[in-house]
Amino acid sequence: MKGERLLSLKERSKEVYWKRRIFICRTFDIPVYFIFFQYALRFLLSEKEDVPPHKPKLIVGGERRGTSSFFKRKKQRSVLGKEKNYLPDIDIQEHLLIIFSVRSSLPSLREGRRSSPQTETNFMEKQTFIATCLFGLEKLVGEELDALGCTRLGTIDGRVRFEAPASEIPWLNINLRYAERLLIEVGRCPAPDFDTLFEGVRSMPWEDYIGRNDQFPVKGHSIKSRLVSLPDCQRIIKKAAAKRLGGAYGLEYLPETGVKYQIEFFIFKDEASLMIDTSGTPLHKRGYRPVSTEAPLRETLAAAMAKIARPRENVLFRDPMCGSGTIAIEAAMIMTNTAPGINRGFAAEEFPWLDGKLWDDARDRALDAIAETEFEAYASDISPEAVKIAAENVRRAGMAKHIKVFAEDALKIKTEGRRGTIVCNPPYGERLSTVKEAEQLYRAMGRHFATLDSWQIYVLTSDDYFERLYGRRADAVRRLYNGMIRCNYYQFFKNRH
């Protein structure tokens, strides 16, 4: 049988693998080249009855664009119909390279994933994800996921679990404004001890995501659990995943030279969640802030502060202690409906089972969604250096039309006869200045901001005695975290005593 003959070629080949529906065979054996090429031609001429039964391999979202840069391609029509083939120049220096396009794959020869998520209908329709976030932002993240059409499954501190199609990975990464990372949940298992953890991790379908040559480093956290040693947890999880992948691909050694899949674990109350990171760089890194002032505010937290303050077109938005300008920029991005991740890259762009066209389409949709608005914001700071940095960040974010940046003492601002909202992040005394200086500033803020009749004031600080120092009780207080610093977000809706 020709199919059996082709299977025997695998043993004589030095390397056989799939790359985006392109079959590549490298070999030093000249006779193998002619035998294999003969089979290839017959296969392209529709002699498919000799092919062993198999399921067609699909790419999530369609065929991915582009191929590796190590060979050149020539496009021409296939003798089988309208499908395009890519027949590159053959370079015979150290080895022979034979490439031909096929309509369906031979799973026993596929070097990548023996069993891929794209072969399962439910992978396209439903995948479980985890959106991580700063403590206190879970509600905003959940509401955002609802608006993006996802199905929430549950929430714990700093994590929102939900379902969505795998094809939505690009759209979610580009649009999530308050989340820190988007993780694929591979599985969950009990973890009262290392043996149970090992067996649980080994039972998970890692080969559905990770190829035989791919990298899979491990990191994570353990909270309120008996397994407290993170290095030991990493070692056990790595070993279990390697055991599963080695068995799936028939390998004793995994080279880990390919695409990087960052495995993350979260063990909470002796239950482990195993995930793969699709974001790479945390989502709070939008790409518009290459340089920042000392103790910068994380972009996701700044966006949450702006959202809670409800920016409006007819109300002046002011940050009189702007630092890097992050709060004003995030407010303008909300008002213009600018996707926060539109100008950055993501780890999942390298995943071969996720169609590259999905990323292009998601970015095109995000660009089309940007809205015109009359929103206006002032970002000012007493430091000329901070003003310079903020102005550059505003320019890089594309928000110069909506944000005016200038130097000014926060204790000298005036209403100018306009309605307004102040949102600020004054020094805490923990990261900037001293506690005594911060307390003096809070007292001065209370005296001066009281003169801004009818303006709404929003202040983020870690000082639990802020209201006493400010001289007024807040109308609402919300617990938020700036990194690992526990803060309170004080909200004064009617600025009158």
Predicted features, each with a name:
Residues 125-137, 141-143, 147, 160-176, ...:
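S-adenosyl-L-methionine
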Residues 122-259:
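Non-catalytic nucleic-acid substrate-recognition regions in nucleic-acid-modifying enzymes
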Residues 297-414, 430-431, 435-437:
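Conserved S-adenosyl-L-methionine
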Residues 223-226, 282, 427-431:
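A short, flexible beta-alpha/helix-coil linker loop
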